[in-house]
């Protein structure tokens, strides 16, 4: 039951604010941790990033929405994951490397973490490596992980814009070949 859960938002930008509003509609308690204090009618308690472990200790579901910067890379490390309740879930829609890859895998495999929904990854295809696994670790073998292919931000509008871009690119390519 969502109404009895505490949602933690790691980062409080546009995406997290939208998630907070929806969580409150379900009656959830909402906590947020951010580098700067931001007031919101949808947040019951705000934490500084320097209080990360205290923030995580009271969370049932943590949603990582942080961008990848020198300050955020590996922010959610083994110690941070240990601060979470064993029944907690981690959802990453920010950037993969904000959460330490090996630490996350180990916490999930040992069942110290209830589960994870991962939409952002550690490895992506490149022109020289068009096919690659999303991680060097076998997250797919774990029964407490839901994996999505970095698509949480996609909407029908996103798909439509991409289709138009592809059509325009194809048309330009064909015209330039003539």
Q: Would you name each region that the model predicts?
A:
Residues 1-86:
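Rossmann-like dinucleotide/phosphate-binding beta-alpha-beta segment
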Residues 87-178:
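Rossmann-like dinucleotide-binding domain for NAD(H)/NADP(H)
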């Amino acid at each position: 039951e969502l109404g009895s859960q505490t949602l933690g938002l790691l980062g409080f930008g546009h995406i997290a604010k939208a998630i907070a509003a929806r969580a409150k509609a379900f009656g959830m308690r909402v906590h947020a941790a951010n580098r700067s204090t931001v007031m919101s009618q949808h947040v019951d308690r705000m934490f500084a990033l320097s209080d990360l472990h205290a923030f995580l200790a009271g969370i049932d579901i943590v949603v990582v929405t942080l961008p990848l910067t020198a300050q955020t890379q590996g922010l959610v490390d083994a110690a941070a994951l240990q601060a979470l309740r064993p029944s907690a879930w981690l959802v990453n829609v920010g950037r993969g490397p904000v959460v330490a890859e090996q630490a996350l895998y180990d916490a999930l495999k040992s069942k110290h973490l209830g589960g994870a929904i991962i939409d952002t990854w550690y490895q992506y295809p490149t022109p020289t490596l068009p096919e690659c696994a999303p991680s060097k670790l076998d997250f797919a073998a774990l029964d407490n992980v839901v994996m999505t292919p970095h698509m949480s931000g996609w909407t029908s509008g996103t798909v439509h814009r991409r289709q138009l871009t592809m059509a325009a690119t194809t048309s330009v390519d064909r015209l330039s070949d003539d």
